[in-house]
Regions:
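Bacterial Sec-dependent N-terminal signal peptides
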Residues: 1-29, 554
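Periplasmic polypeptide-binding modules associated with outer-membrane biogenesis and secretion
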Residues: 24-34, 44-259, 270-272, 286-293, ...
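Short glycine-rich, acidic/polar surface loops and turns
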Residues: 478-480, 509-517
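Feature marks short, surface-exposed loop/turn motifs that line or immediately flank catalytic pockets
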Residues: 355-357, 404, 441-443, 499-501, ...
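C-terminal outer-membrane beta-barrel translocator/porin domains of Gram-negative envelope proteins
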Residues: 258-261, 376-486, 493-497
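C-terminal hydrophobic structural anchor segments
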Residues: 485, 490-513
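Gram-negative/organellar outer-membrane beta-barrel architecture
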Residues: 205-208, 212-227, 231-397, 425, ...
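Outer-membrane beta-barrel proteins
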Residues: 72, 322-328, 403-413, 536-539
Length: 554
C-alpha cells in the first residue's frame, strides 16, 4: 500500500513537471554576425515571449517587414535555431536603402505634390515612402475611388537607392445612391438629408461612413442595432442603416423637502413632460409645471420642429407664465430659428419678449409693471458620450442679445448674455469628473427685481431653495466626482460654487452634498442631499435639501 502511494506521488510529480515544461513561454531572440546590424536589431520593439511556435514565426515575419519599411529591403532570415525554449533568429540586413526614386505617370502626379518632381520623377526619403503611399490611398478614398490600386512596379535597388514606377489604377468614383433604413422604416427622412448631410451626390468614402456611424449615436429617439453596411453593385452604392425606435418620451417628477423658519415642512414639486418623435418627425414637445407651496408657480410650454420644409432650419417656440407669491406675474414668449451646421452644432437667431405685472400696486420691493423684447444670436455645440445615461461628453451654448425695456412711457436699452459649458472627463472605467459652468449677465441703466434671472435648486445651485435667488449677474460651477457602481448606476459628490450679484449686493455661495443615480428598465431615479451656505450665513443642517428626481420613459 505504501509502495503504491509512493508511485502515485512520483507519477503526479512527473505529470506536473511535464505540464510545467509544456506551459513554458517560447523566447525569441534576434542576432546578426555584423555588429552594426545587431545594433539595429536591438532597437526593434517586438514581442519576445510566445505561447505557440506559429505566433513566434509570425513575429519574425513582422520584424522582416518592419526592416523593409525602414530601408533594409533585402534583409533575410538565415535560420532560426532552437535551444530548449529559446528560438534565435539569425538576420542578415544587407545594404540599407536611404532614398526612393519614383517615376510618375500622368495619373499619379497630383497625389505626390508635396515632393518636387523633375522629369516626371520624385525623390522620397525611404522612411516616408510607406506613409506617402498610404496618403495616396486615403486621398483616393476621399474622392470616392475606394477600389483604386496603388502599386510600385519595376522595383530595382542600386547602391542605397530604390528605383520604381508608381502605378495608380483609379476605380470609378462612387456616390451614395440610396440610403435604406432597416428596423425603423418610419425614421424621419429629413434627418437623412439634413442631419447626416446625405444626398444623391454624396461621395462615398470611409470617413463619411464613420461620421454617419458616430452621428447615429447622437439621435435620442433611436437605438443603433449595428454599424452601417454598404452594398456595391456594378453601377450603384447602397448604404444600409440599422435603427430601432426607442422609448424617448419622458415624465420627470421632482419632490423636494425642506424646513421653513417656523419649523413647518416646505414641499417643492414639479412636472416635466417631454414628448419626443411622437409623429416620427423628430419633433419635441415639453410641458413644465412647477409649484412651491403658495410662494411661486410656473407653467412653460415648448415646441420644436426639426428641419422644416426638408431644410436645415429648425424653429423652436416657448411660452411661460411665472407668478411670485401675490407680488408679480411674468409672461414670456421665446422663439428661435436654428440652422444646422452639422450633427453636433447649430447657429440660431432668437427673439424673446416678456411682460410683467405688478400685483402689489406699490414699489416697496422695486417691482414695476414693464415689458421688454430682445433680439439675439445663439451658438450650440454638443458631443454625446453615448453612454447608458445619455450624457454629453462636451457641451457649450452661448446666447448674446440686445433689446429694450419699457416702464410706463420710459424706454431703456438693455444687453444680456448667457453661456453654459460642461465637460465629462473619464479618469478610468469607473471614475469620472463632471464640470459645468453657467454664466449670466444683464446690463441696464436700472434694474427691477421682477426682471432678474432666478436661480437656485436641483438644476442650478444645489443646497438652496428652487428659484429663490434673484440676480442680474451670476456665474456658478457644478463639480461632481462620479463613481460607477454598475453599468446603470453611479454615486456622485456635489460641490457647487457661485458668485452672484443680487439687489442686496455681491455674495459667494457654496453647496455641498452627495447623490446617487440609478436606472431601471423604464426609469431613471436621482437621489441627492445638499446643504448650502452664503457669505453672510453659514451651514445650517436644519436647512438640508433632499431631492428626489424620478424620470419615467415611455
Amino acid at each position: 500500500m505504501k509502495q503504491q502511494r509512493t508511485r502515485n506521488i512520483i507519477f503526479l510529480f512527473i505529470l506536473f513537471s511535464v505540464n510545467g515544461l509544456l506551459a513554458q513561454d517560447l523566447i525569441l531572440k534576434l542576432v546578426s554576425k555584423e555588429q552594426n546590424e545587431l545594433l539595429v536589431l536591438k532597437k526593434i520593439d517586438y514581442v519576445k515571449k510566445h505561447i505557440k511556435r506559429s505566433s513566434l514565426y509570425s513575429e519574425v515575419d513582422k520584424i522582416s517587414d518592419y526592416l523593409k519599411n525602414i530601408g533594409y529591403f533585402t534583409n533575410t532570415v538565415i535560420k532560426i535555431e532552437k535551444a530548449g525554449t529559446i528560438y534565435t533568429a539569425h538576420f542578415s540586413l544587407n545594404a540599407k536603402v536611404e532614398t526612393a526614386l519614383i517615376e510618375l505617370d500622368s495619373n499619379s502626379k497630383i497625389y505626390v505634390d508635396e515632393f518636387q518632381s523633375k522629369n516626371n520623377t520624385v525623390t522620397i526619403p525611404l522612411k516616408k515612402l510607406q506613409n506617402t503611399l498610404y496618403k495616396i490611398s486615403k486621398n483616393l478614398d476621399k474622392e470616392g475611388k475606394s477600389f483604386s490600386k496603388v502599386q510600385l512596379k519595376k522595383i530595382k535597388i542600386k547602391n542605397d537607392t530604390l528605383y520604381a514606377v508608381l502605378k495608380i489604377n483609379q476605380s470609378k468614383k462612387r456616390v451614395i445612391d440610396k440610403v435604406i433604413i432597416k428596423g425603423y422604416e418610419n425614421f424621419p427622412r429629413s434627418y437623412i438629408k439634413n442631419y447626416f448631410d446625405l444626398s444623391d451626390s454624396t461621395t462615398f468614402n470611409q470617413l463619411k461612413i464613420e461620421e454617419i456611424a458616430e452621428a447615429s449615436e447622437g439621435i435620442r429617439f433611436i437605438s443603433v442595432i449595428k454599424p452601417p453596411e454598404t452594398l456595391f453593385t456594378r453601377d450603384s452604392t447602397f448604404l444600409y442603416l440599422y435603427f430601432k425606435k426607442k422609448q424617448s418620451h419622458r415624465f420627470d417628477g421632482i419632490a423636494s423637502f425642506t424646513t421653513k423658519e417656523d419649523g413647518k415642512i416646505l414641499f417643492n414639486g414639479n412636472i416635466d413632460l417631454k414628448l419626443n418623435n411622437l409623429l416620427n418627425k423628430g419633433e419635441e414637445f415639453e410641458l413644465f409645471w412647477n409649484r412651491i407651496e403658495n410662494e411661486r408657480q410656473e407653467l412653460k410650454l415648448t415646441s420644436k420642429t426639426p428641419y422644416i420644409f426638408d431644410s436645415k432650419l429648425s424653429p423652436e417656440i416657448s411660452f411661460s407664465i411665472y407668478k411670485q407669491d401675490s407680488i408679480f406675474t411674468n409672461t414670456t414668449f421665446n422663439s428661435i430659428i436654428a440652422y444646422s451646421i452639422n450633427s453636433k452644432s447649430h447657429f440660431a437667431i432668437s427673439y424673446n419678449a416678456e411682460s410683467s405685472e405688478n400685483l402689489t400696486k406699490n414699489n416697496l420691493e422695486n417691482i414695476e409693471t414693464f415689458s421688454n423684447f430682445f433680439f439675439g444670436l445663439q451658438f450650440k455645440y454638443n458631443r454625446p458620450k453615448n453612454d447608458y445615461f445619455d450624457h454629453d461628453k462636451f457641451f457649450i451654448e452661448i446666447n448674446p442679445s440686445v433689446g429694450k425695456r419699457k416702464v410706463d412711457q420710459e424706454q431703456s436699452k438693455q444687453f444680456k448674455i448667457e453661456a453654459t459649458a460642461s465637460y465629462l472627463w473619464d479618469l478610468n472605467f469607473r471614475n469620472s469628473i463632471y464640470v459645468r459652468n453657467k454664466t449670466f449677465y444683464l446690463n441696464s441703466n436700472s434694474y427691477l427685481n421682477n426682471e432678474l434671472s432666478r436661480i437656485g435648486g436641483a438644476n442650478s445651485i444645489r443646497g438652496f431653495n428652487e428659484q429663490s435667488i434673484f440676480s442680474k449677474k451670476f456665474s456658478y460651477l457644478n463639480l461632481e466626482y462620479r463613481f460607477l457602481t454598475s453599468e446603470k448606476s453611479y454615486l456622485y459628490t456635489i460641490t457647487d460654487i457661485a458668485n452672484i450679484s443680487t439687489p442686496g449686493g455681491n455674495e459667494n455661495l457654496l453647496g455641498i452634498g452627495l447623490g446617487y443615480l440609478f436606472t431601471t428598465k423604464n426609469a431613471q431615479i436621482n437621489l441627492s442631499s445638499a446643504l448650502g451656505r452664503s457669505s453672510s450665513k453659514g451651514f445650517d443642517f436644519d436647512q438640508t435639501k433632499l431631492s428626489v428626481n424620478w424620470i419615467s420613459f415611455f
